[in-house]
């Protein structure tokens, strides 16, 4: 089996949301841009998804995985257990499943989601940064779940401490201190980005807006997704590279393309789960596949195919933009590291979605992984 002597994170199942008659991806030579010539010993693992029996319909050549997934998982589980053990007056609302026999399964799901996201999207992060990013993601997923499934979407959670940047909950005080100790320069940006996500979500809840007149309207709404500041702050914190605003300014278009691709991938891979929850618990469907299906009066399979084709178009634009930077001799080392970190997020986001249990259990085309 591949990687048997390396700390690959175990995979169980993967899935393809479209199926065997999917369109082929564009032929783009990302490998020539991002292949490392001299790989350091502490480098992330490079995974070739098809060797692991993960369906990989994309022009992206590989994904990378952090070696520190065990530490990330332990940190995430520790935080959610500490929060859930608090009195209700101290920790605010919890996901509804925490109140009954579904508690363990829900904790496992949240931790798996956060760890998977952290180790594939931010693979070059140090062990401490992986732990803190896993916890950050878990807090966002935890809060998001309360907002989506709560009766009013106005319930307070521990994440509301990030809005004021003055934590009251003892676990949030500890988290703030650990982030700032790890990186006093980039840490505040990560904490503020979590606060922006929480605050914006209350004012512009995606769960309250699920009808769009045009596809362009939907895509514009998602391009300004409430998660975008966090997505970018997490990349910067994970890489640990401190850059001036002048050094990061040239990458605005590359960042935007990364966000666009991430949104399309998320919508494509989460569609079946969203539709199931719409039928069973009256959940809202905020999804490009659904918008295409309704506006164009096409069946779900065709809407998924169109969504995947749109992601291919973004990959073409991303390749052109990243080629411009990676072949530019004027690019300094810090800027190059950031471009590579963005590419890791692009590939990692796809792998994360394709192997995530909370999505694969609703899928039709599921495969056992080989790890």
UniProtKB/Swiss-Prot annotation:
The keyword Magnesium applies. The gene is Ffsc6. (2E,6E)-farnesyl diphosphate binds at residues 358-359. A motif (WxxxxxRY motif) lies at residues 352-359. Belongs to the terpene synthase family. Terpene cyclase that catalyzes the cyclization of farnesyl diphosphate (FPP) to the spirocyclic sesquiterpene alpha-acorenol. It comes from the Eukaryota. It comes from Gibberella fujikuroi (strain CBS 195.34 / IMI 58289 / NRRL A-6831) (Bakanae and foot rot disease fungus). Mg(2+) 1 binds at residue 144. Coiled coil: none annotated. Disruption phenotype: Abolishes the production of the spirocyclic sesquiterpene alpha-acorenol. This is Terpene cyclase 6. Binds 3 Mg(2+) ions per monomer. Its EC number is 4.2.3.-. The 2 conserved active-site motifs D(D/E)XX(D/E) and NSE are required for coordinating the divalent metal ions that stabilize the PPi moiety of the substrate. The C-terminal WxxxxxRY motif is frequently found in terpene synthases and is important to guide product formation. Mg(2+) 3 binds at residues 266, 270, 274. SUPFAM superfamilies: Terpenoid synthases. A motif (NSE motif) lies at residues 266-274.
